[in-house]
Each structure stands twice: as C-alpha cells, then as structure tokens.
Amino acid sequence: MCDDEVAALVVDNGSGMCKAGFAGDDAPRAVFPSIVGRPRHQGVMVGMGQKDSYVGDEAQSKRGILTLKYPIEHGIVTNWDDMEKIWHHTFYNELRVAPEEHPVLLTEAPLNPKANREKMTQIMFETFNAPAMYVAIQAVLSLYASGRTTGIVLDSGDGVTHTVPIYEGYALPHAILRLDLAGRDLTDYLMKILTERGYSFTTTAEREIVRDIKEKLCYTALDFEQEMATAAASSSLEKSYELPDGQVITIGNERFRCPETLFQPAFIGMESAGIHETTYNSIMKCDIDIRKDLYANTVLSGGTSMYPGIADRMQKEITALAPSSMKIKIIAPPERKYSVWIGGSILASLSTFQQMWISKQEYDESGPSIVHRKCF
C-alpha cells in the first residue's frame, strides 16, 4: 500500500497551533494557529473577495474585524465543522497536497474521549478520502523525538498538560495524569493580572496580543518568593512591550507570576496539583522498579514548556519530592515546541510502522471503531 515515493502527511493538531508536514522531514513545513475567524461586521465593499470564514494566519492578520474561535479546547475537538476547515486548509493551502494520495498521521492527547478519535477517523476517510491513517498519542511521539524508549513526558501545550510514563516503548495508561491547565489558561491569567496594572484586554483579538506578550516576556522563577521581593525592590525585572497601536506598556512581576500558575494552580482557582507534583504522582503510580528510570528521563515537550528557567525549576521541585539519593534529570530539548510533530515524522517513516496504518479497506469493513483496535 505504502510505496516509498508517497510520503505520509504528519499533522499535529494542537489546541493552539497546528503543525503539519511530510514524514521524514526534520521540521514541520506549516505551523499556523488553530483558529477559525468569522467577520464581526457586515461587508460593504463589493468584489473584495470577502469570505465568511478565515483560517490560521489569515484569520490572525485580520483579527481586528473577526471573532476568533479555537475549535480544539483542552485537546478535545469541540467544533467539528471548524476542525474540518482547519484540515482542509492544512492539506490544500498549506501543504498543497491531495489527501486522497497520502497516508495521514494525526495526533491526540491521552485520555481523550473515544468518540473524538472515531470522529477524526471518520472525517479522514469519508471527507478527505485518505488511503490510510493513524492516530498517535502526542507524548509518546515526543519521547521518540528525544531518542528514548523509556521516560516520563511532561507535555504541556495550549490546551492541556499531561504526564505520560513510558517504559520500553509502552505507555502505562494507569499512570497517565492529565491536567487541564495549559498555555491558554496562562494567557487568560496574564490578561487578568495586566488589568490590575490598568491595561484592559478583553476581545478575542486582544487575547492574541497578550499571548504574544506571554511568549516574548514571561519566564519561570527559580524561587518565586525571592523573585517577588526583587521585583518589589527594584525595576530591574521590568520590560516594555509595544502594542500594535504604538502604545508602550511595562510589565514587571507579571512576567513570572503568569507561568508560576503551572506550579501553583491555586492562582487561577484550580484545586489540582502543579506540574511538578503531577509528574511526581505519575511516577509514583508506576511500578517501584521502573521509577528510577523515569526520574532520570523526565522529558519536557510542548510550547508551554518553553519558558526560560522551567527546567531548572522542575529539577528543584522534583528533587524536593523524590527520595534524596535519586538521580533526577530533566531533559528539555531546544526543539521541544515541535517535538510531537518531529516524533510523528520519525514514526511515520519507520519501515516497521508501515503495517500499522489503518487502511481505507479496513475502515470500510469495520467502521470508525477500528481506531481503538489499531491505534494504542
């Protein structure tokens, strides 16, 4: 079925960004926001070629007149019509391929509802007529990308964070933990604490500005209390940011108060454990014999793991929780923003993987539920 000439397509549909490209490449060809925008106003000029919806970068550039919606929330697709638009845009506009000619590897968050992956499968075969497809777990792909078969992956994106322990290539489902606290919640929290400074951001378009501030200026403090004291005592931590209209705003302790939420979810009123404790709890749910290997191979992945200082802080927090003699190593590859995609590219180009694809024929015989039998 899968000749060498036909490259598989790898599509990592994140809650915030969609990463797409060809298996065997070392980086995704297309990276664009998972956004569908619809005009807020009535079009008055004829012949402008206005559309009733815009996807990705085009929606982002016209955000001033659009209402922006993310069809994926917390890693789960909540609006399938918009999701189809994003896939259509991925295949036809970004990659410029005919999906009926290529196997497609999709990714999903662990512990997702079964109906979610069935619907993904159905759309790929029925709407896009793909010859074959597969759904892989995001965190497992990140581990592949780091060149390991054993380790615990802390994957934190825009919509969901999860810890997935993997031993010799097997994910341990009983020990997977999921935390619905990720990049989008941090953006919302930053919007809130910037309001305390007197800067008001409210619309869906303004949220994107705040997301940019977060990505450019935020960092993780090694010692939160001490950093707060430093910020209060001097202006050494202050940075300025120019808004699209030329206004310049200054932010200080917000720079590290925002990502601190990952370690103290109580900041946004969540009762759950922080990412360090979640990682520790996940390791503790595993067999006592393999914990040592997990502590020594803790891999960070996803865009929300990109804050400067986060690896050192994780090292410090997990060292405090773990037995004192335990060797702890936090691996934070520089390309971790795309490591899920890179892992997918590696997986889909392995010769041993070629028999794993769900073919159109198998789908026609068994229906969407085939995905649970063939994809872990």
UniProtKB/Swiss-Prot annotation:
Name of protein: Actin, cytoskeletal
SMART domains xrefs: ACTIN
Broad EC category: hydrolase
Positions bearing N-acetylaspartate: 3
InterPro entries: Actin (IPR004000), Actin/actin-like_CS (IPR020902), Actin_CS (IPR004001), ATPase_NBD (IPR043129)
Compartments it resides in: Cytoplasm; Cytoplasm, Cytoskeleton
Protease listed as a keyword: no
UniProt GO cellular component terms: cytoplasm; cytoskeleton
Family membership noted in the UniProt record: Belongs to the actin family.
Annotated coiled-coil segments of the chain: none
The keyword Methyltransferase belongs to this UniProt entry's keyword annotation: no
UniProtKB keywords: Acetylation, ATP-binding, Cytoplasm, Cytoskeleton, Hydrolase, Nucleotide-binding
Pfam families recorded: Actin (PF00022)
Catalysed conversion reaction: ATP + H2O = ADP + phosphate + H(+)
Propeptide: 1-2
EC number: 3.6.4.-
Lineage: Eukaryota, Metazoa, Echinodermata, Eleutherozoa, Echinozoa
GO molecular function, one term: ATP binding
Functional note: Actins are highly conserved proteins that are involved in various types of cell motility and are ubiquitously expressed in all eukaryotic cells.
